[in-house]
């Protein structure tokens, strides 16, 4: 069980670092896994020998942990699990090339080391070698009665990056537990494609979803987002309006439609739609930020300030509302407050850009 907990921690760490999933989803996926074959003996021996290595790794002292492993390798001719532990430590250090080399060696020593297979797939992916990641990640999927969500997502991304879009669709269909040829499958894949900046293929898949089921919730919204992304604003508006006919209680559609109207400088229409979006969902910052921009364009700067202050109260680390608030303060002559907000916006943007 310690091995399973270790793999959960590593996958959670990877997901946090890549900002793809939450660590809790990784833990849930591990609950479905078949128990990985242990590569270490019970009690003393490897567990005891690797204890200090794991302690150093938990503290982020990866070079020291690797030095400990190298000492162990020099002192003992055979230490079961040593290659595996090298791979884990290199993985946590983000040295994915060396992690792959270590996991390959671990699998030569124990071909049924499931942890090594999964972490090798992740290492290939993080090293930018999507084609090589596919084989190990496909194998991971055979261990689960239902999809391992983390591995299925990454596998789908790898298929996309190698331009194998039908296989990506099947991976996402399994992930969401829908038929591979269904409208929902095309919708989910189109969403993932847009997120990864594959806009032309995303449009193709979204249109296919509409063809299969014109009344599928959110499909017209996604197509509208794709058109907005491509600056095809009239077409985006048409799709958002179709979505509202099917899904009039969806706050995000009003927000997206308001965004489209604001790009055409139709600020009155945009303001009305933003009010409806906020009435339906007062917890999202996007409509408040856009409301601030729209009100400022209308010359209602005092009201714009209130909307932007509300957005900042909800998300104080977002640089955009601080920047817009600084501009609004400058317009109404509150120079000192304007400079403070603009400086803070710049600092937050630098911090945001510095994140991996």
Regions found by a protein language model. Give the residues of each.
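Alpha-helical segment of the N-proximal tetratricopeptide repeat
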Residues: 45-71, 75, 88, 92, ...
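Helix-start (N-cap) detector for alpha-helical repeat units in TPR-like alpha-solenoids
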Residues: 46, 80-81, 114-115, 147-150, ...
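Structural signature of tandem alpha-helical TPR/SEL1-like repeats
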Residues: 60-67, 93-105, 127-139, 162-174, ...
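Structural marker of alpha-solenoid helical repeat scaffolds
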Residues: 75, 109, 143-144, 177-178, ...
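Canonical tetratricopeptide repeat
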Residues: 85, 119, 153-154, 188, ...
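TPR/TPR-like (Sel1-like) alpha-helical repeat modules
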Residues: 313-315, 319-353
